[in-house]
């Protein structure tokens, strides 16, 4: 069967369901595909058990089960991720295996917010999920209007607690199961209403090409008579010949350099963009003054830092991680973009140790400054093998 051509005419948004176990995330995912297919004739209906049997994937050596479905509203194309287990969410969000432009928080009206409701909101805050829309599920089981209002208030308070705009967050009351059984009926209307909110409340993501230029340096060599060339894959933005860039990381001071040539597959170009593997010819810098692990970027857009807070997942023994816990002051290597830097870890107050399989918020102090920003992913390594995965939650200095 030939693959269908991906329709690029609609804006594309990545989304996912989050929330406590058994509050109806997977049922909602199935109901969405079914309802949008019934109402608009777009996409395909995906059955519950097909989503529930999520295939295992390995992302940076970590085993994660995730289901990917896609669907369309009249305005947009969505890629949606749903995870069967809580551990899969934690791993997924920390490794960035499934980047989310926004999330649908599913909360059962019958139970109200539960521990994982809170944990998923916190994780969303830490890993930089920018927008959350709430689906209050199982409303067919609750007759009491006051109870619904109470649950709604609790959810809003919880969102506020983790610095999401709880008071302005769209909350839709519905029943995923009823909508799945009768997508054309009144409960199906609730799914349509949910997506009217999502279409407007979750903005289109900025494409990598529209962001400020950044390229991690992978290799450096000098060409006699022409100068120094730095190679790497452009992470974001566009670079043109004669642009000024800044070299950031591994040294105290950043310095500005002019790009005098852009080369790709041995051909000279006027410009390169996000996703391209290129060599940049740099004027007035010696090969010894630039090294792997630094980044070239638009001047002033990123700074070198040594101290930051991170959300970390520690690999289990079965995933090739450590067999033993580690303690406060543990000093592994932190692998950012293209290089390892040693750093010391500081555990939260009152926490003695971290076991393989745990996720933890910790402070990290690197021995060299690195170009870091919130949302940047990294691996934790010991002697070249990955023992953990993390994401920068906030910069300290």
From Swiss-Prot:
Q: Which Gene3D superfamilies match?
A: P-loop containing nucleotide triphosphate hydrolases, Translation factors
**Where is the stretch described as G2?**
61-65
Region annotation (G3) maps to: 82-85
The EC number(s) attached to this protein equal 3.6.5.3
Superkingdom per UniProt: Bacteria
Provide the residue span(s) of the region labelled G4: 137-140
Q: Indicate which residues the UniProt annotation says bind Mg(2+).
A: 26
Q: Name one GO molecular function term.
A: translation elongation factor activity
Q: Which residue stretches belong to region G1?
A: 19-26
Listed HAMAP family: EF_Tu_B
Q: How does it assemble?
A: Monomer.
Q: Please state what the protein is called.
A: Elongation factor Tu
